[in-house]
Amino acid sequence: LIVIFPEKYGGTVWRDGAEGKRPETNILKELLPYLEKQYAVTGDRRQRTVMGFSMGAAGSIYWGAKYLDLFSAAVALDAGGGTSFSDPKARNYVPEYGKKTEAIRKSLKLRLVQGALNTRKFRESLNTLKIPYDYVQLPRDISAYPAESSCLNKKDLTKKFLHNPACMTEGKWGEQTWSFIEKGTHRKEKQ
């Protein structure tokens, strides 16, 4: 099982060409083939997931749909607004969802874990296209979090800090995400 986690490639929205940067080329066309060759990493899309946080979540939404040949599952942890398959001016324009709807329905497992940000419009678009997805909204009630939770503001425990990757992957929602990834990928049986 391989999990690609796009993170911190500032100003690119995970597309080649933005600000002269090449995240798609660097990671998917250079690094991934290198890892496959050097470390016997699988090239089987059924054993690959793309998962990201915040802008990396936007990247996972984009790469998951654009590169169906590379990934069987995409997980977006607290993706921000601005994701659209129909508005080319949107911050995170992902036309693949409108162009490859049937292929996405059949071959991409999609999970959205929401903390502080909002994907309501993107979820409405997925519903319109009848693209299935798994959705989790982190609890709004502060009492839902234990004192040691990464979801609490350490300077003021009466406040939540939901927009952080540690919060997104802890507790039952974190366990559910790893379970989702395992179900979304198909591991080869050990011989």
Placement of each model-derived feature along the sequence:
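Non-catalytic cap/lid and distal C-terminal segments of serine-dependent acyl enzymes
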Residues: 1-191
